Amino acid sequence: MPKQEWKMEYDSPALVWDDALPLGNGRLGAMVYGHTGIERIQLNEDSLWSSGPMERNNRASLGMLPTIQKKVLEGKMQEAEDLISQYMFAAPYSMPRYECLGELDLALNQHTSFTSSWTPHSLDIDSYKGSLDLMKGVYTLTHSQDGVTYTREMFISYPAQVLCLRLRSDKPGAINLDIQMDRQKYSDQKSLDDRQPGVVKRGGGWAAVLLQENHTVGGNTILIGGETAGIRYASAARVTCDGELLDPYTMLRAQGASEVCIYLAAATSNREKDPKGCLLYTSDAADAL
């Protein structure tokens, strides 16, 4: 099969979650919509659950299994089903819920970026070409506006364990990029639906993992984190650029740049004793490459 047939190409951004393009390395994942004005990238880390490991084995199941098998072979299906309902379910019946990690939000050349009612959207542009190389796992978006061509490249490295994003312009100093991270605090509140940008919905009846930290660190890193039910999690986005990097504490702004790079790492206490320390070390290592 020709190599180009392993590449998915698009002439417009995704409007719903099902159409967004997935990136991942088996542990860290992202869903990319491809908006050119304000972009929201949904993030996942496979060990982020609503609680830690738990023992749910039903200790009575094994002893009752021969009896149930005998009932089935005798054709006594109702009796077998009754025993199954009594002896074969986990204890407790419910299990921890998988939780999304959060979002990485990018606003390119916006006068007002992340207002209280912002939604992901694309600019009035001259050209648009998005692609996902299925063999390399690299997403590329190229668009032109006002005589400037912008190129965004993204992939998630397995060796470095970070999401890597690079935004370039073909004209010097044409990039003014606002970067923030966020996470829905409670799923039972009205909030933006990540699957349908711009749509406000009401979630389920339980709280999501609490976001207790959302601020910059060291003038070049955005950190989010929280703890609930004994599970600690954190994610950090390290930002470098060839322009000026401003630090308003709640976000970072790359101003007058021709190239911006972001390295995003994440960790939880389901896998690491010190998630925050682990991901900051990972960010330092990626930044040094």
Report the location of each language-model feature.
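Aromatic-residue-lined binding/catalytic grooves and analogous aromatic/hydrophobic interfacial grooves
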Residues: 1-283
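A short, hydrophobic C-terminal helix/tail in secreted or cell-surface proteins
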Residues: 284-289
